[in-house]
Every structure is written in structure tokens, then in C-alpha cells.
Amino acid sequence: MTEPHANKQLEILRFIYDTVEERAFPPTVREICSAVDLSSTSTVHGHLARLEKKGYILKDATKPRAIEVTEKGREALGIKPKDIPIVGVVTAGQPILAVQDIDEYFPLPPDLENDAGELFMLRVHGESMINAGILNGDHVIVRKQSSANNGEIVVAMTEDNEATVKRFFKEDGYYRLQPENDTMDPIILPVVQILGKVVGLYRNNID
């Protein structure tokens, strides 16, 4: 394969990656044509086939526009894996003071690579969310956001500047932070600040 072809394939790969990063879904073949100055869609299909053969992209035959840039493809573009900051410990039992310091970083799981939000991780202490599968010592992956829908699991800051992991409910005139443990009572608050929504879970040990 000649060098110009290789460069064109990397150009296509970069456009696919940037488009998915920007809008969370890949471009059409015609959009690729326009972006890389190719007039023939068949030429683009040929480049995509070669990129797939190299292991730079994955395509789903059942979904024409489903194109995913693989880890190998990102390496070819010089893109390092994303990391999530681990910002401390949060309780799943009694609320504790929120920790904002960044302790370390954790590699972003592949299934969250297209998440457009700002993510962080917290280590969970306590057993109030065990019925939701969140155990003492787990790390929750949180998308930073200030609102949530009823029933979603959130990290919330109470009026005493304490953070807790609970299931969120907005009731008539108050907020209910509901534990997922039949032996524990909900936290009832007139005001609550949501720090983010729990979107993932990491556990590094199995009992």
C-alpha cells in the first residue's frame, strides 16, 4: 500500500474519531467523503474495509453506520487512553464530609468512552446500597451533573456539606434519598445538591 493511501486512511480514522467524540455517533460515508476530499463513496468503503482489516475500527454488519474506533486505532492516531480521576471516598451509609482531592486516576472503561459528560470515581463505604449491587469498597463511576430523574442513583451533597450515594426521588415539597437496604431509613431533605449520576461500577475483589 502506498503512503498516500495510508495517510488518507488515517485522515478518515481521525475524522471518525473526532465525530464520535463530538456528537456520540459516527459520520455517514458521504460525510467522510466530504471531510477528506473524496468524491467516490466506494473509495471510502474500500478504506473502511482496510481500516477494519488492520483492527483500527469495528463495524456492525447489522447497523450500517455503527463504526467504532478500537484501542489499536486510537494508538495509531497517537491518542492515549482516557483516565477518570478518583476524587476520594463517599459513604453509602451515613453521610460523610465530601472529599474533593484527587487521589489517583483509573482507566476509562471502553463502554463509557463515548460518554460526553465529565466523569469521576468515588470509593464507597457502607452497605446502604447493597440491594442495588453497590457494596462496601466498590468504586462508583459518576457523571458530573446537577439534576437527576426520580429513581436514578446519585451522589448527593446534603445541606451539611456531606456526600452520600442514594437513589434520588423528588417528592411534593421535599427530596428523598432512598437507600437500597431494607434495614435503613431514607434521608429526607428540603434542599439537596446533586453532584452526579452513578453510571458505572468497578469492583477489584470478589468474595
Curated annotation (Swiss-Prot):
GO aspect biological process, one term: SOS response
Site (described: Cleavage): 92-93
Domain of life: Bacteria
Keyword Phosphoprotein found: no
Keywords from the named record: Autocatalytic cleavage, DNA damage, DNA repair, DNA replication, DNA-binding, Hydrolase, Repressor, SOS response, Transcription, Transcription regulation
Self-association state and partner proteins as the record states: Homodimer.
NCBIfam families: lexA
Family in the record: Belongs to the peptidase S24 family.
Protein role: Represses a number of genes involved in the response to DNA damage (SOS response), including recA and lexA. In the presence of single-stranded DNA, RecA interacts with LexA causing an autocatalytic cleavage which disrupts the DNA-binding part of LexA, leading to derepression of the SOS regulon and eventually DNA repair.
Protein name: LexA repressor
Organism the protein comes from: Lactobacillus gasseri (strain ATCC 33323 / DSM 20243 / BCRC 14619 / CIP 102991 / JCM 1131 / KCTC 3163 / NCIMB 11718 / NCTC 13722 / AM63)
Gene: lexA
